[in-house]
Amino acid sequence: MIKIKLKNGLEEYFSCGTDVLTIIKKYLKKSEKTAVAAFFNQKLIELNTPLKEDGTLEIINFKHIESLKMLNHTTSHLMLHALSIKYPNILPTSGNFNEEGFYYDIDFQEHKISNHDFDSIEKKMHQIAEKKLDILKKEFTYEQALEIFKNNHYKKELLQENKNKKINIYKQGDFIDLCSDLHIINTKLIKYFKLLKISGAYFKGNSNRKQIIRIYGTSFFNRNDLNNHLKILQERKMSDHKYINKDLNFFMLSQEVGLGLPFWLSKGSTIRRIIERYIVDKELIGGYEHVYTPVIANINIYSTSGHLEHYRDNMFPAMNMPNGEKYVLRPMNCPHHMMIYKNKIYSYKELPIRIAELGMMHRLEKSGAVSGLERVREMTLNDAHIFIRTDQIKEEFKKIVNFIQEVYRDFDINNYIFRLSYRDPLDKKKYFNDDEMWNKAENILKEIMLELKLNFTEVQGEAAFYGPKLDVQVLTALGHEETLSSVQIDFLLPKRFNLTYVGEDGKKYSPILIHRCIVSTMERFFSYLLERYKGFFPFWLAPLQVILIPINLDNHLIYAQKIKSILLKNGFRVEINQKDSTLSYKIREAQKWKIPYQIVIGDKEIKDDIITFREYKKDLQIMMKIDKFIHLLISKMKQK
């Protein structure tokens, strides 16, 4: 017999091997219709799991996040079941899921599929779900599983990687699939789902392999939740920087040029220059020296830094030179800044040395990860490396955190979290193997954040290979968590490059290195701001601040040119709409382009030597003298 304690405080004895569902039916009948899974001794289990030891049992219902994850996971298998009936001989590979949805990658072989097929696929899914099929898990040996999936080379490859682990196969009706995650125990709970989109994918993200099909979907326990989520997805789509850019033309992408290689168009380039000048000016005031360094380098420098060992898969292939040397497009700016420091002998009195650069880098992002400006293969990082003494670590780190917060205030960024990113101590391949160094750096990082009295989360496995870091995390419009700012403590690279400074006693010491970026890459930061402002940038950032609209080009253009000249001389970004279109069309166009101020020029404006303007999204028209309008714009420029 085993003793089971329920969450309501009840304790009962059961036969060893009694499953959770039996206990629910006997003692928790109110939970029977809404039960999805359970925690047993704090471990998530399925309702048909037999219990074989004493423990505490907690039933979770439709509202629990783990229930939604299990539902979406199980729905992905229901989709596979339907697809296997409609499209015989397909080869399922693998998928993923969370509380909001799922996807599965499938080799359809000779079959063609598009989103136009979704209705018929969903219909088949409903037909299967309504059969109320039990979903059963069974454990198999490696050899047995190989025989079952002998006709699916993708599954055989996955089995090969897990041959020494337990191999679970799930069955619903006559459909089976290899799976290690948890399921709900009957298809009757799968009622409210929607297939969302199709994209290309590669097995294990390897673009050298055959391109297969990825199908996305989402599933909920009731219709209202599904409908609400579909509305949210539509809102996210409309807030996605790629969608916003369709009307505003800040950047473009070209498959002919290459994947992940963006073009900055005129208006996007204007905003980028403003951001770059802003951050460079702040860094110069903060004691940084700004440099330019080569975008390619001898591969040996990345061997010295360790990037070649730990980052090779993210680097573009080497270029073979006639003299036998190998050059690579740099994936990081760090080694170049190490060489600048090494070019001179420093005294302890001269530290900190702060070297900053808007450094262009190239990274071979997987094709499936490339997205708009958010994930690209060519990027420019707001990068800096600070060389300090041990006694300067905390003071310098705190300055950087304050710098980040100041910049975020200016850009009106207020929804972010601090994350301390540590190594995974078991992963000796990914991280430099020096426990003492890692423990020291991680402890210092945590002490600093506690002293600053800032809330933070801690995660393992997200550190750089050479040291732990503070990441500032934001959410994109699509719900992806991205790093906007990063500060890293590094005891390793200065030693690998033999960097030193002369101490007070005349001896040579190795400096400590802080890597930091305040606004990420220009590409990622711009994509975030585009979503943050939904294309309507604050006045000081707007690529075009004022548009002049002459009612009649023959009669009003000269006065418009005069106003434009005055505004340009005062430092404002202004254009004249000289299209041969109606006034209402030009005003609609200005609204579409989200221009902060629209000035209409007609007979009255010329006669009284005034302007008539209105602001974006406002109907009120205001008349005033140009000098007063300039004072208004100057005050707007100061509102960061």
Swiss-Prot record:
It is an enzyme of class 6 (ligase). It comes from Phytoplasma mali (strain AT). Zn(2+) binds at C334, H385, H515. Belongs to the class-II aminoacyl-tRNA synthetase family. One of its GO terms (molecular function) is metal ion binding. Its EC number is 6.1.1.3. Homodimer. One of its GO terms (cellular component) is cytoplasm. Binds 1 zinc ion per subunit. It comes from the Bacteria. PANTHER family: THREONINE--TRNA LIGASE 1, THREONINE-TRNA LIGASE. It holds the Pfam family tRNA-synt_2b. Keywords: Aminoacyl-tRNA synthetase, ATP-binding, Cytoplasm, Ligase, Metal-binding, Nucleotide-binding, Protein biosynthesis, RNA-binding, tRNA-binding, Zinc. One of its GO terms (biological process) is threonyl-tRNA aminoacylation. This is Threonine--tRNA ligase. Its main location: cytoplasm.
